[in-house]
Amino acid sequence: MTITDSVLSKANAKEIKSVVVMTERLKKLKREWEDADPVVYVDDTLLFTKSWKETDGLPVDLRWAKAFAKRLEECPILLRDDELIVGSLTKFTRGNNVLVAMKPREVLEMAKTGRFDRKLSDISATYIDPEDLKLLIEDAEYWVQHMPTVNYVNEALKEELGEGHFDLMFDRGMVFEGRAVRVDPDRGLFQGWGAFGGGIAQPTMPVIHNGLNHVINLAKAEIDKMVDQGACLPGASAAALRKYYLLKATIVSCEAIIAYAHRYADLARDLALKERNPVRKQELEKIAEVCDWVPGNRPRNYWEAVQSLRFLHLACWKESSERPEVGIGRIDQILYPFYEEDLAQGRLTRQEAGELLGAFWLKIRETENLVTIKREHRAAPGTLLPDVTLCGIDENGRDLTNELSWLVLEVMRQIKLSEPAVYIRWHEGMDEDFMLHALECNRDFGGGNPAFLNDKLGTDRYLARGVKPEDATNWLASGCLGYHLECGEHMAGMFSINQAKIFELTLYNGFDPRTKKQLGLQTGDVTQFTSLEQFYEAFFQQEDYFAEILRKHYFIWWSSENMNSPMSGLRAAMLYEDCIPAGLTSREGGARYPVCRASWIGDRGITDVADDLAAIEHLVFRSNKFTMAELLDAMAANWQGHDDIRQMCLNAPKYGNDDDFVDEIFNRVSLTTQMILTGRPDPFTGEKPMLFKGAAAGHVTQGASVGALPNGRKAGTPLNDAGTSAMPGMDVEGPTALINSATKAPHAWETVGITHNMKFPKAMLTSTAKLENLAALVKIFFARGGWHIQFNIHDSDELLKAKENPEQYKNVLVRVGGYSAYFVDLPPELQDEIIARTLHEVY
């Protein structure tokens, strides 16, 4: 059975597959963006600072809202030739936005040293106008001088945990990872994961379907209710005043977004008056009509719905542009009612729908922030993680796949950009031909889009935490393989433990060979150990010790931030309606489910630890190939002069080959560490946390701090990627064996963000039969309880050529962890790690 002859032909699958997304218009717009040099854009940050100076003394929510409004009212706006969907983050074709108040010292260091790089490579170097550079330096110097006590968090940590605690942090010992666990973070007005309301926000379906005027009316009605009840009279409680100003800030922000859209309407009208081409003139008049109406009101058609989604997504970025993970949401569900009605009324063709969606896709990708953080500290270089979620089932078990689900994939395949990322909520009732279409698009895209999530597993996690079925089924992908409810939930700050580092400390009795300091417990001289059980005991003791330290760090950090650093949380209040009557941001408990998923703690490196223990058991205790002392000597020399020992370590049993010996070690290590880390309740909510295993590129940054390991890995090289992927090149028994290893530990999938990467050659997936075999592999993976799976599909020599000749391969896409990226933008060590991943075959 072919895709176009399937049961979905009645859903016009064949016509959708024939849609030409890359029209001459979109080819031109994409080419202009690709050819443009990234330019630093300073207007927004200067307007923010100007407003902040003007509003000194006002409540922080209102100050933040007014600064947001000033940017929308006065920032330059850009409407490029041939655009149909409008709204640009900057005035440049390819601009890098920055909000200096968020990271003034990082910006100042970059500006004064002239170190401008958008991502990680010379190919994507960023330009800044000399006059703008002067203004940027002035802005950064102002904020450095006017920040609250810069090290207030560190002072609190020092007082509670001692000076030695800093040796564990990310920019020293690298036992812990995260922006909030650095000795010298750039602490601006707002900091850390979980800032801006403590929730990941994106334009939600109710806001788009009802319009921002509806949100304004809700906020005004709540204020009227407070006035009627006398809650705003002199002597009102602090909580009442807090609610009042949050509501006022919400109104100011929503009105500013509507006014911003009207600026585009006026610009389009002005351009239409000057336009001589009658076709373009009509398009500009249509753009003006659309922008006059949305996002203030409910869209009247598909074009308006797409434009409303663009304005609201852009507004989220404008409001707090340094916060990543502004998702796009369940786009096939959001837009489908308007698409369906327009098709039925003859107002829209599928071709027109595809071009409008493609125009939207380009606008999402053009959004870029200036990357200032040092290269070695970047977990996800350059990516902004604007995720799209498709399909799934509702509370009644109905398959929600629709025509737009197909069309989104076609847009993604043809336009071929690193972002947005697309995630499909797979379920047992999914149409087989849609699955083949998804894999076909995956093959043609090459860089891991779409990825697949287990729909039932995601829903069951929420049901188990008391979420109503209608909400539990309405979840979406967010960030780096996280997920959250569309109706809103609280997400705390994020901290990760480097498991490979903890195991290294175990090998040296708590001593760190890198910093030459005693960082951990003295759990015993491993050269005297006589069984693997002693290694388990020592490692788990270290784990328990560091888990408690990190929990204390989290409590001190979050408490100190709340007391000292203003966090408006405006975006979450604006987009989650439950926050309005509560008068609280999602961070403060205003979301519908404020404590349903506390996932403040994460880890990386479990598969490395499993391989290490397997090598020790196999080579030291069972076969007596060498002693533990000899192994430590070889690792201390980073294997130089010990090639024989290293080769034996590399050849030892490895996770990912359906080998019960090493898989049982992985299961025990992952289960026990998970119990240790989640056995401590969130100190604020009392909830049992869900362990976060988001991939990004943390295996590179954390690997930099870890010496040689018993699995044969060299010092400073990347750890194993993702949560259940094997050591690169060591999963040699085929894809089924890897999947069997990954799904033997069901507890591993009861986490957030755990990733499973696989790589296949494009040449092997050219036939429908091979795609059907790959689809069967995905089904087996999910049937065995897997959560997430994604594929890099490249021929073996393509990436090698791209590394050698980057200018010729600028648009080659790869899947890193929970995101896709341009291969040439990645650091060499990450490029090498992706190249080294096993190239599996589909039979």
Set out the residue ranges of the language-model regions.
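Structural signal for well-ordered, non-membrane alpha-helices
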Residues: 262-265, 269, 365, 674
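Extended non-globular scaffold/tether segments
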Residues: 244, 248-260
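Conserved catalytic cores of very large enzyme subunits
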Residues: 2-247, 279, 283-286, 290-293, ...
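Heptad-repeat amphipathic alpha-helical coiled-coil interaction surface used
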Residues: 251, 258, 265, 269-272, ...
